[in-house]
Amino acid sequence: EERPEDPAALARFQTLMGELAGAPDAEAAGEDQGELALLEDDPEEVFGRFADAVPRTGEGGAAGIGDTFGRLWDGAKEALRQLTYFEMKKRAGVVGKQGLGPLLGRIHQADPELRIHLLGHSFGARLVSFALAGLPDGAGSPVKSLYLLQGAFSHFAFADALPMDRSRSGALKGM
């Protein structure tokens, strides 16, 4: 396991994280600002905050000094885990809006009497919610019920106006 004691290596790791994640989800930007901070703030500060959030054992000996760079690399690993969460959120929204939503529209067009009921948990809740945003305009929604369990998104996703920026709305406003 390579953990160089070099701030430039931490910065490079943060850059690579950004390349893995691609661009943040502009549509869902109102939900959290954490993804941008994770990729744009000072890497030592970001990774330090993540390291502080995870308990460590057996560090520092009698002086309690510990391994500063080891701690920051532990934080970097936690930051990468968080980034994978953001990436999965983005993916679920894209699949819902660009995949499931249009598919439900085609099913409805083929059989307008069919009643569709959707259920989703965690990222699945996000997927089925964004499917509503991906339904074709016009013919009315074929979805008769939507049940969300512990959805992987903020309730602000449905807001007409975001509390932190009243000029913006949630990505699922009006759903």
Question: How would you label these PLM feature ranges?
Answer:
Residues 1, 55-175:
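Serine-dependent carboxylesterase/thioesterase catalytic core
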